[in-house]
Amino acid sequence: MPEKSLYEMAVEQFNRAASLMDLESDLAEVLRRPKRVLIVEFPVRMDDGHVEVFTGYRVQHNVARGPAKGGIRYHPDVTLDEVKALAFWMTWKTAVMNLPFGGGKGGVRVDPKKLSRNELERLSRRFFSEIQVIIGPYNDIPAPDVNTNADVMAWYMDTYSMNVGHTVLGIVTGKPVELGGSKGREEATGRGVKVCAGLAMDVLGIDPKKATVAVQGFGNVGQFAALLISQELGSKVVAVSDSRGGIYNPEGFDVEELIRYKKEHGTVVTYPKGERITNEELLELDVDILVPAALEGAIHAGNAERIKAKAVVEGANGPTTPEADEILSRRGILVVPDILANAGGVTVSYFEWVQDLQSFFWDLDQVRNALEKMMKGAFNDVMKVKEKYNVDMRTAAYILAIDRVAYATKKRGIYP
């Protein structure tokens, strides 16, 4: 578990970078705080006829550089603190990538596994109607997150469109391709992780074809990261895990086969061609690249001394606590931070939004080439700041992002 609340952890990362910059204290205070927090309590009629009331959130952290952008998650443990932290991170993630967005995030406190498909649709449509007062294709553009997918985005898009009386494709991203979605969106976060893993190997002088990689978390991000790292970089993926545990094989896995197995059996732990390990053991394996792509706070003060990887490429949001960051930095382990490493998803969401506004759609190669170019550009921008300030990559990414948002805030001024 994280030693601090997620929001405290996010603010601490911000403060660490802000203290190294010539940032006025009042401007820092503006950048720390969320612009708008909406809490909604809304009724949903269940299949048996009774009505349940659910709690939902939408937080817009900052809109100095453009509309708020960020996902909506469905989870029984969703809290306002968590949603505020994730919106905060989205502000810096979009700025690191130099996208014309600010940060937003949303969530509903619900266990979607306990809902029928009809109940899930009714909940989704009612929640989106409730937050419609603050969203729009030029205000705030939601996207999928934990337990939400292209189907949910289609319901959101239809709900908003019905309410305004015409089809508005650009209200959400992560939609089905047939409904204004972008090709390459599903693989985008994993592809971004792959690009960053390859660039981290370049920095450390590791030959990708001889590199070993462990991936914690085998959902969308972990699966695509593992697949693309093995297929396009030629590295050996020697360990993967999901919520039930992990498997290890020093000879490497056939990741395509592993993904098929996970789809059929719901887990990787029973896969016969690997030795069973725990999630904790996976993190401490002697590999070149570790990709934490599961939950927040996986690498913490309690295990950071035992991490043996040469680089950590963060597929998840907030997988490394500030205390662990200090330990890894002291030990010379390169950490490619979440606000850079997993920004592939929001970058292709940007491409989708642009395509929707223009009603002009790109082919898959255009999407992939544009994403790889932007990820490499952002990685190099962060490395320049890292060298200039002699700091770790996370602090450098924050300095770069804060500088961009602070500049926009100062140039816009305070209205009235």
Curated annotation (Swiss-Prot):
Its EC number is 1.4.1.3. The active site is at K105. Transmembrane segments: none annotated. Optimum temperature is 75 degrees Celsius. Thermostable. GO terms for biological process: glutamate catabolic process. It holds the Pfam family ELFV_dehydrog_N. The keyword NADP applies. One of its GO terms (molecular function) is glutamate dehydrogenase (NADP+) activity. It is an enzyme of class 1 (oxidoreductase). CDD domains: NAD_bind_1_Glu_DH. Keywords: NAD, NADP, Oxidoreductase. Belongs to the Glu/Leu/Phe/Val dehydrogenases family. NCBIfam families: GdhA_Arch. Homohexamer. This is Glutamate dehydrogenase. The lineage of its organism: Bacteria, Thermotogati, Thermotogota, Thermotogae, Thermotogales. The gene is gdhA.
